[in-house]
Amino acid sequence: MSLPLLAVKPRTLDQRVVSYEVPAEDDPVIYRLTDATDAAAVDALIWAAYRQIFSEHLILASYRQPFLESQLRNRAISVRDFIRGLGKSEVYREQVAAVNSNYRLVDISFKRFLGRPTYGQQEQIAWSIILATRGLEGFIDALVDSDEYQQNFGADIVPYQRRRRMARPFNLVNPRYSDYWRNKEISLSGRSYYQARYYASGPLDKQIVRGAIPANFLSMARSIVVPTLDTQRHVARATSSLVKVPNTAQERDLPPTPVKPVPVALPYRYLPSQPKV
């Protein structure tokens, strides 16, 4: 038996205040299935749902849900059921739920499914109890079936951020994982193998690792090493000994060329050979 939702006192957030703002380009686009009259409009609605639930940097071809898309295109399910299916998919479980604590997962899910942040730690604790007792699928069902979701989005509207005044939408907040997970990844990547692994009895040091390795392991590894040969050198030596180079020298009976003295103009020839006294 799951525990009931604890009472939470709401806070004054942007979406709870009456707006007198002038419409601008930053206002969210509302996607309704009833307004989608052609295939292009349905595709735009589907991609808007992916951007809202999976976040912009998670829209990959491998993350798409073709079964849910086919049902939505054929009007077999509503937009609310499509959003429910995206929240229960393995992509949301692995990329969002598995890398965050329960408190941060509640806050992220509220931003993506209800379009608002949580009312502080009190609401995060209350909904984390639902997450712990009902699991991720029960938590998604509780969000989608809540009165707040029905009043703001109904069955045909893709969830969006209500009254956004931030520089970036909720679904684009990066990173998608919490500080604890990021610091854990950094600590594991900067430590050695002996420091990263732990047993229940304590840290795994080098002595325990060496005890698990047989004494003759290194000698056995050296014995199976195949000696390397310079194949190119041996092939070149074998081929060069078999190749016969033809003799291209031409043998002719030519008379010897006579050598005659040739007068040479030596330098400083204008000087007398014997100096005059």
From Swiss-Prot:
The keyword Secreted does not apply. GO terms for cellular component: phycobilisome; plasma membrane-derived thylakoid membrane. PROSITE patterns: PBS_LINKER. InterPro entries: PBS_linker_dom, PBS_linker_sf, Phycobilisome. It is a peripheral membrane protein. It is found in: Cellular thylakoid membrane. Residues 11-189 form the PBS-linker domain. Its main location: membrane. It holds the Pfam family PBS_linker_poly. GO terms for biological process: photosynthesis. Keywords: Antenna complex, Membrane, Photosynthesis, Phycobilisome, Thylakoid. The phycobilisome is a hemidiscoidal structure that is composed of two distinct substructures: a core complex and a number of rods radiating from the core. Rod-core linker protein required for attachment of phycocyanin to allophycocyanin in cores of phycobilisomes. Belongs to the phycobilisome linker protein family. This is Phycobilisome rod-core linker polypeptide CpcG1.
